[in-house]
């Protein structure tokens, strides 16, 4: 009965859709037709509608990343109080700001950066200077150049006062276009009779006279002391011997001639090389290395010339010192041979320059022995004071920072000042902080082998210098009877100018 009354009750058939009250059901309400977006999505990809029924609203959007080529909008819940809003963040809008997005991983470079320790140190950029001070000032080069110019002006003035002309024209013309050799001797050129007893002077059987500094003829009217100048030297007397005491002892003629020059051609060529190649080398290796090689090469050259050149030949000029600097350029080329773009071209240019200089050394007033001696000393000292070859530094794991350790070089001026503050050791003569224990610790066998080469070069030049000095003062004349021809041309009697006695 109950079941029959239920199925046969007032509701014999279910109510129609139209008979249902839709206003009271908040979950089954028919949503109004969504209104179109005010702008197309393709034209405004970041447009966000406030209407939740907008198909472009973020409430109903999960755009396909793979199919959408446009910019991605910010997904996720916009209204935190809307329980039906999606909260799945896909991608933030414009994550790179104004920068470009990174390349795909397949297009990114795969090579690794080189080891910083094996690279040349980066020189920090400084504010560029204009004019004469654009580069680092080569103080030693400029001081030497100024001194040599002043001395040459004094030579010309003295020559003009003594002879009436600053340039020698009588009894013969000076091919270097400058003062006579007698004025140069009087001002300190290397002249063997003013430095020691020589055959044909101290052991002469009759009085020996020399040309005067003001001579314009071939006459000899002055004594040796008047020609040598300064405080004078003991004059030889007839019937003397090579053992006479006191003997001439103007040893400073091994040093002073570096500041004297025999003419405009001589000083012009030397200063051109000195102000270009010399200044560049000083900037590269530092003032104290440059000054050491310059002075040592010049002195060594005059010592060698005093032993083997003609004893009656006067010699002056800084050519020997410049040949020592040229030797440093040769070493620098050989050290970095594989790093040079055209090493053979540079070597050929250097060889040609050396050959031309030796040809000029055959002219009066110049000395090829000074050139040879200066070049030899430059090579030996270069091995001692310059950096190691690049190939050796790479094998023993040293960075290519040549001249920072003891300052004064091209890398030292750009060195980090904080690094100098933190280094330990003693500051010797302002040359930089040096820590012997840390310097020699952990060195490899190749490093020690190269330092043995350096030590051998230093010992060799010291022994050679001592032997040449002893030989110069021990033996009155050279044991090589033909060596003097290496420094003169047998024309116009040039080789006879050095003859004080018959050979």
Curated annotation (Swiss-Prot):
Example of a GO biological process term: proteolysis
SUPFAM superfamilies named in the record: Rhomboid-like
Extracellular side: 158-253, 305-316, 364-365, 471-503
InterPro entries: Peptidase_S54_rhomboid-like (IPR002610), Peptidase_S54_rhomboid_dom (IPR022764), Rhomboid-like_sf (IPR035952)
Active site: 319, 371
EC number: 3.4.21.105
Its membrane topology: Multi-pass membrane protein
A molecular function (GO) term: serine-type endopeptidase activity
Region described as Disordered: spans on this chain: 1-66
Transmembrane intervals: 137-157, 254-274, 284-304, 317-337, 343-363, 366-386, 450-470
Biased composition (Polar residues): 1-11
Domain of life: Eukaryota
Entry keywords, A to Z: Hydrolase, Membrane, Protease, Serine protease, Transmembrane, Transmembrane helix
Disulfide-bond pairs as recorded: none
Cell compartments where the protein resides: Membrane
Cytoplasmic side: 1-136, 275-283, 338-342, 387-449
Record's catalysed reaction(s): Cleaves type-1 transmembrane domains using a catalytic dyad composed of serine and histidine that are contributed by different transmembrane domains
The keyword Transport is assigned to this record: no
Function: Probable rhomboid-type serine protease that catalyzes intramembrane proteolysis.
Family note: Belongs to the peptidase S54 family.
Protein name: Rhomboid-type serine protease 2
Protein species of origin: Emericella nidulans (strain FGSC A4 / ATCC 38163 / CBS 112.46 / NRRL 194 / M139)
